[in-house]
Amino acid sequence: MKVIETKYNGKLEVAEDRLIAFDQGIPAFEDEKEFVLLPFEEGTPYYTLQSTKTVDLAFIIVNPFSFFPEYRVKLPEATIVQLNITNENDVAIFSLLTVKEPFSETTVNLQAPIVINANKQMGKQLVLGDTAYDRKQPLFQKELVLAKEAK
């Protein structure tokens, strides 16, 4: 067990097998190499991706397919190799939220999903270069906003 201080839940004991390694960090947070996935609030679709090193670094994330069933992510071969993915059922995809006031104006980044190999506890943020998905998609808007034409 590892004791970590969290932004939203105070001090927690976390099993070592729940720690997720981000070997390259997350863009703009390259020194942050270890996170834990926690429910933000029971009964909601929101999670926290909490740094185990920096208390105040906690991203609010969601499963984008819960809000946008037509959303698609094709993993590049390099990501499959980097995360040691051998079974597609081991892959979990999350998207970062930008929480706004009022909450109904919150946006989700569909252009750079968080990809986690749940079996190996390895993750990365994948920037989709050839996508029309927006990085500021309104979370509660049912239609996807296409930022640009896909290449």
From Swiss-Prot:
Gene encoding the protein: fliW
Family assignment from sequence similarity: Belongs to the FliW family.
GO-annotated biological processes: bacterial-type flagellum assembly; regulation of translation
Described purpose of this protein according to its UniProt entry: Acts as an anti-CsrA protein, binds CsrA and prevents it from repressing translation of its target genes, one of which is flagellin. Binds to flagellin and participates in the assembly of the flagellum.
GO CC annotation: cytoplasm
Compartment(s): Cytoplasm
InterPro entries per record: Flagellar_assembly_factor_FliW, Flagellar_assmbl_FliW_dom_sf
PANTHER family in alphabetical order: FLAGELLAR ASSEMBLY FACTOR FLIW
Name of the protein in question: Flagellar assembly factor FliW
Species name: Halalkalibacterium halodurans (strain ATCC BAA-125 / DSM 18197 / FERM 7344 / JCM 9153 / C-125) (Bacillus halodurans)
